[in-house]
Amino acid sequence: VMKALLLGSIGVLAETSELQRRAYNTAFVAHGVDWHWNIATYCRHLDTPGGQNRLRQLGGDALTTIEIRRIHETKQDAFAASLAGGIAPLTGIVETLTAARAAGLRIGFVTTTTPRTIAMIREALSGHIDMSDFAVITSKEDVVREKPDGACYELALSRLGIASHDALAIEDTVASQSAAIAAGIRC
């Protein structure tokens, strides 16, 4: 019997990729980095979970850890500004959450994004989705290994006190789907 519905990423709740792509480009300009991500380029980079991980992978030796952190922080500031007026949830997600709750399922948000990003998304979606009643929310700070490692899902299962076969995960990238599958969760 299914006991929990685990939402695995921001992209399951709302479409933010374009806002994040623009925020990265703003950060690149602000830090004098001669990069510009068009839509196709940014979509390819989504194969690597985690903004700082993407920058590290793409920058190679060209960017220091401190530069990566600063660029990402500026990106986060620009992203926060773009979310200030709120955002719409993906079509059908509110209805899915309502039906899951009506069926007695516990809802979880199992992500390895930063607590700051979670707070921004929570606020931006607050007119549509109340994340305060989610049974579990994980972040990057809760695990040593980020997705595609299954640690975040294993933690969520532990916090919920359920087995992997009692949950269903919804993810929006192959890497993130791999995390759920690694933890033995249907996705």
Segments and roles (model prediction):
Residues L13, P89, I107-V110, R145, ...:
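Conserved SAM-binding loop
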Residues L13, E95, T173-A179, C187:
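Short glycine/proline-centered loop/turn elements that form peptide/ligand docking sites
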Residues T114-L168, V174-S178, A182:
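Substrate-recognition "cap/lid" segment bordering the active-site pocket of phosphatases
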Residues L6, A169-I170:
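Generic enzyme active-site microenvironment
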Residues M2-T91, A102-A103:
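N-terminal helical cap/lid subdomain that shapes the substrate entry/recognition surface
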Residues Y24, I93-A124, A180:
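Substrate-recognition element of Asp-dependent hydrolases with the DxDx(T/V) motif
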